[in-house]
């Protein structure tokens, strides 16, 4: 069989195209990097990979907003080079100190000794100096602006979304908000825009990102959202976050999700039943609790911690009114995975007022595990109308029926 000939340099051309910049608007480009195989970030699973977004503005002053994780220097530089020689960059804006955003500041600075670097003051200046030494940073605050030619960029500090140095950059000329961590998702895709991807999956990843990264700072996130709204109803038609896809067709959807679901603390009538089990007894109790919710007309999800990562639990937890956490007793303590969940949950500081908790579990000679779960849930602010639900050794069918009925009555009465 005769092989079809390929154009000379075909593979090189394809690779060059893959590592080319993506135009967002005239003279504004995405030049970031894709970490396809990343599966963990700060303790939570990133099954869809990670995108480190950086943005290039071609104006009288060539401006780069954020960089990428240091190991992606070549990818970043190749994408920039598809538009302009990286040594021609005049201004670098660091919206966030964290190394997945700032890791290539030394790379860019090394190419241009006259580079001007702007970041938040004082936290950004302190953080970047600690990481990379004194590169002559220019600290900016909310209300400060920077003229780069026909564009004037405005800065708004968004502290603790999710570090003290965070800020966003607004390009009024193009109506683009470079939002840094706000409105982001850990989601690697060859398609850059929201409308080029499965919107349901993008929104799911945005929710998971909020639940596991931004949730402890929901009041700060709400303030950042308010600042965006204050720009005016027609001021932003594109949101370019530091991770994930760029919002252009569904800007209103992600703003509404942050406002009405993520930061509001509004709870839905749904339940999650999370547990670990040693020999199956606590698992049987978990199923009875789940059945009790279903009998009361409450949607419920059963989550065995052997098969579900704690970061996925927190995604479902975000707006669940009912949370059941179960563990047998192991060495007078809850099972390690349950203890890890409770520790992780405590760190994310969810708003638990109005949330109903059901601590439960089996035991042999002392119910120390379930009682420890109950204590931690009570300290976290859960209401515990059933106190702690326990069963010694293997629960009988009669005991399982009692548990199911108790949960049904409780959920039906609320």
Question: Where do the PLM segments sit?
Answer:
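Conserved beta-strand hairpin/beta-sheet module of binuclear metal-dependent hydrolase folds
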Residues: 21-81, 168-171, 175-178, 282
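FMN-binding flavodoxin-like domain, especially the glycine-rich phosphate-binding loop
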Residues: 189-192, 200-239, 244-246, 288-305, ...
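Short N-terminal or domain-adjacent regulatory/targeting segments
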Residues: 238-267, 340-341
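Metallo-beta-lactamase
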Residues: 22-26, 118-166, 220-226
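Short, charged N-terminal beta->alpha structural module
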Residues: 274-295
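Active-site neighborhood of phospho(di)ester-bond hydrolases with catalytic His/Asp-centered motifs
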Residues: 65-67, 89-97, 116-121, 177-180, ...
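Short, solvent-exposed beta-strand-terminating loops
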Residues: 28, 177-196
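Active-site metal-binding motif and surrounding structural segment of the metallo-beta-lactamase
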Residues: 60, 71-118
């Amino acid at each position: 069989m005769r092989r079809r000939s390929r154009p000379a340099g075909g593979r090189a051309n394809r690779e060059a195209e893959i590592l080319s910049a993506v135009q967002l608007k005239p003279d504004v480009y995405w030049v970031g990097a894709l970490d396809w195989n990343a599966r963990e970030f700060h303790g939570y699973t990133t099954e869809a990979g990670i995108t480190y977004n950086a943005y290039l503005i071609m104006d009288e002053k060539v401006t780069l907003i954020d960089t990428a994780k240091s190991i992606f220097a070549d990818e970043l530089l190749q994408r920039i080079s598809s538009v302009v020689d990286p040594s021609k960059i005049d201004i670098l804006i660091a919206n966030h100190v964290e190394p997945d955003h700032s890791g290539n500041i030394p790379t860019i600075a090394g190419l241009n000794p006259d580079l001007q670097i702007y970041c938040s003051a004082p936290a950004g200046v302190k953080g970047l100096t600690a990481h990379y030494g004194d590169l002559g940073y220019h600290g900016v605050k909310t209300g400060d602006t920077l003229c780069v030619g026909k564009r004037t960029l405005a800065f708004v500090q968004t502290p603790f979304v999710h570090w003290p140095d965070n800020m966003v950059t607004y390009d009024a000329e193009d109506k683009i908000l470079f939002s840094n961590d706000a409105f982001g998702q850990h989601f690697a895709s060859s398609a850059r825009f929201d409308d080029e991807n499965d919107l349901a999956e993008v929104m799911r990843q945005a929710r998971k990102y909020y639940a596991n990264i931004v949730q402890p700072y929901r009041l700060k996130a709400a303030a950042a959202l308010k600042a965006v709204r204050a720009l005016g109803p027609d001021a932003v038609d594109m949101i370019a976050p530091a991770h994930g896809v760029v919002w252009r067709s569904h800007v209103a959807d992600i703003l509404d999700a942050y406002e009405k679901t993520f930061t509001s603390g509004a709870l839905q009538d749904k339940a999650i039943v999370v547990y670990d089990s040693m020999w199956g007894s606590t698992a049987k109790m978990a199923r009875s609790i789940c059945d009790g919710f279903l009998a009361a007309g409450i949607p419920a999800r059963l989550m065995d911690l052997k098969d579900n990562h704690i970061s996925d639990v927190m995604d479902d937890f975000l707006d669940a009114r009912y949370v059941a956490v179960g563990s047998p007793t192991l060495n007078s303590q809850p099972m390690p995975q349950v203890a890890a969940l409770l520790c992780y949950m405590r760190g994310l500081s969810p708003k638990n007022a109005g949330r109903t908790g059901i601590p439960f579990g089996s035991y042999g000679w002392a119910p120390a595990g379930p009682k420890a779960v109950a204590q931690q849930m009570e300290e976290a602010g859960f209401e515990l109308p059933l106190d702690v639900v326990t069963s010694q050794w293997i629960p009988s069918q009669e005991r399982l029926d009692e548990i199911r009925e108790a949960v049904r009555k409780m959920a039906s009465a609320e």
